[in-house]
Amino acid sequence: MLENYQNPQIYTYSNYDEFHDIQIEVIPSFIAEKSAPQNDYYFYAYEVRIHNLSDGPVQLINRHWVIRDGSKRERYINGEGVIGQRPVIEAGESFEYQSFCPLSTPTGNMRGKYEFKTPS
């Protein structure tokens, strides 16, 4: 059974907010060696890339994620910044971070938003 989950079909996501000139890319990956399908445990990692395409700096202040497994159970992740940081992203620069998301089903999805402000 485990071999069926070695290379699941995974979709990357990119969104561009034309009004604020911020582009967000999310690149998920299935981590087979940390997963245990026989125990309904599927481990996914993801990389987030935030590109500031505006003319000035922005600061990431909050994140709001909804993680939904294949059984439609949802978890909510809300908090200040990401990975303990509230990064200031200069004009033309990017910020990247990695995190993970274990699921109890082989499929699922994530959606959410980031809140930014112009640093003082």
For each predicted feature, which ranges?
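Membrane engagement elements in two modes
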Residues: 1-43, 55-59, 68-120
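Hydrophobic beta-strand segments
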Residues: 63-65
